[in-house]
């Protein structure tokens, strides 16, 4: 891909099928997501909750009129660090046919700018330990692996 002109916008419900397809399009996502048609109601319910929360922003990335990426930003208030707000970047995906073309970098730089505009003092994200390429990518953008994350499935 030579032209990496993109537009980033707030996701709408019509984008859900494309978003879920991207979430399911890797080794980990294929085991966690339900990319069946019609779309599972759980995604519609989650979208409504995200869309109605002013501290959540689900976005899509368009290139040549097609949705090719997505990410979710959460703006998190906190008491530590003198009441500092944090930006949490999650669900970063790019369609497999255009990965490596610079769009991911543009997406993350845009997300960081959004966090700055909202007054966040830091931006954080997590990625699965098995995603070595993602780790290298985030480090190239200045992220450091300063903390050890833990999860408990419920």
Regions from the PLM with identified roles:
Residues 48-60, 88:
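A short helix-loop-beta-strand connector motif used in the catalytic cores of GNAT acetyltransferases and
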Residues 78-89, 99, 145-146:
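A conserved beta-turn-beta hairpin within the catalytic core of GNAT-like acetyltransferases
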Residues 105, 117, 129-147:
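Conserved active-site alpha-helix within GNAT-family acetyltransferase domains
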């Amino acid at each position: 891909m030579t032209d990496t002109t993109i537009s980033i916008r707030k996701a709408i419900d019509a984008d859900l099928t494309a978003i879920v397809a991207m979430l399911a399009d890797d080794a980990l996502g294929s085991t966690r997501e339900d990319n069946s048609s019609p779309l599972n109601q759980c995604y519609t319910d989650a979208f409504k909750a995200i869309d109605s929360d002013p501290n959540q922003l689900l976005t899509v990335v368009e290139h040549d009129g097609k949705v090719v990426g997505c990410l979710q930003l959460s703006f998190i208030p906190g008491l530590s660090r003198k009441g500092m707000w944090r930006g949490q970047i999650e669900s970063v995906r790019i369609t497999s046919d255009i990965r490596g073309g610079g769009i991911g970098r543009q997406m993350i730089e845009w997300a960081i700018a959004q966090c700055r505009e909202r007054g966040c003092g830091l931006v954080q994200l997590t990625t699965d330990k098995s995603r070595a390429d993602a780790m290298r990518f985030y480090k190239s953008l200045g992220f450091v692996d300063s903390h050890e994350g833990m999860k408990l499935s419920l």
